[in-house]
Amino acid sequence: MKIVVREFSRERDLEEVEQVERSCEVGPASKISLFTHLLGDPLCRIRHSPAFLMLVAELVEEVEENGRKLERRRIVGMIRGCIKTITCGTKYPRNFRSYPTVSQKPVPIYTKVAYILGLRISPSNRRMGIASKLVNKMEEWFIKNGVEYSYLATESENEASVKLFNHKCGYSKFRTPSILVQPVFAHRAKVSKRVTILKLTPHEAEIIYRRKFSTTEFFPRDIDSILNNKLNLGTFIAVPRDAHAPINWSGPEKFLSNPPESWAILSVWNCNDVWRLEVRGASRMGKGLAKTSRIMDRVFPFLKIPSFPELFRPFGIHFLYGLGGEGPKAIEMVKSLCGFAHNLAQQHGCSVVATEVGRDDPIKTGVPHWKKLSCDEDLWCIKRLGEDYSDGFVGDWTKSSPGLSIFVDPREF
């Protein structure tokens, strides 16, 4: 018996991979669990990245049949990974020391990173070192492609995952952003009448993001690819009413040269067309109460009852990313944008709106969410793979202190 790790082939592996996915989704009957439906595409969560790879682990056994020795192969695990270039730090331009009196802003330092996700091992084949083999093989591909750091996200309560990556594979705790989840109600969310919301073109959004957010940790260098992706439903900016009426919008350059006192921005990513989630293990009474709340919300929308959405069958999500803003009323602007995004998700038949922000990011207070559905501390772990660094100003990024904000790539949520 041996384990062979190789690249995923849709033609020969799809059925077996889906079987392993389903077997890994069997949780304790007494507990509520969250399961992912990949809609027939095991690559759906990585295929929009600049470079990606999926590996499968095959268990090869020798069997005897009619006096002949044969090899029997079956897939018992898989892992996914993608590569991109992101911001890992900042520095001042080279001429800053020569002209210290000139007002200059720091510029981003980029590095090539890899993200690991979707590690699955068949329950009957665990504790055989298969997960370590998959991680090691994936890291070989990362290194071959010039990756300097590899990182992943997991739950701090997932002891098996933490033990595998932190104790066996050399990863360490790095960042702990917060995942904020808001149900989509039957009634429309309130959007402040003191706020005007404008939709930007991908090019306009790119200009603002690069000018204002490119020094934020994990900012993707290929932000233009994200904004032009078909899954991106748009970038929206909130300003005080009448400050920048749609008919007077003169473009991002003039906006940035003379911005209003307060403003905020976010983009919406449509996960609904790529994958869906499902809550399993809820009691019959719990499902009944949730259904009753939805009926009441639909019949009496003016009461604005915070109904519990239909999460007990596959449901869609809109992911909000690139949240930010400036000014004393930026939080109010963010709240209005989130209300607008809620109503957009309602139009698209989604049950949940989610985002992920820095744990101590001030913007967090402006994002409506249910604590019971959210995760205050999503654990990100990192490992240094390359000896050569993109810039000497950074040093060893794994030992750096976190900033207030973090840019979460929607392609990896």
Feature annotation, model-predicted:
Residues V63-E64, E71-G77, A160, P260-S262:
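Glycine-rich acetyl-CoA-binding "A-motif" of GNAT/NAT acetyltransferases
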Residues I121, R127-W141, H167, K329-N343:
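Conserved acetyl-CoA-binding loop-helix of GNAT-fold acetyltransferases
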Residues A57, G81, I121, L266-V268:
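GNAT/GCN5-related N-acetyltransferase fold signature
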Residues A114, F142-E157, P177, Q346-R359:
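Conserved GNAT acetyl-CoA-binding A-motif
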Residues T85-N95, Q104-I116, P309-L320:
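A conserved beta-turn-beta hairpin within the catalytic core of GNAT-like acetyltransferases
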Residues L14-R22, V26-M54, T111, N166-F319:
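Amide-forming acyltransferase catalytic core, primarily the GNAT-like/NAT-type
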Residues H342, H348-F413:
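C-terminal functional modules
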Residues K144, S156-S178, R359-W380:
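Conserved active-site alpha-helix within GNAT-family acetyltransferase domains
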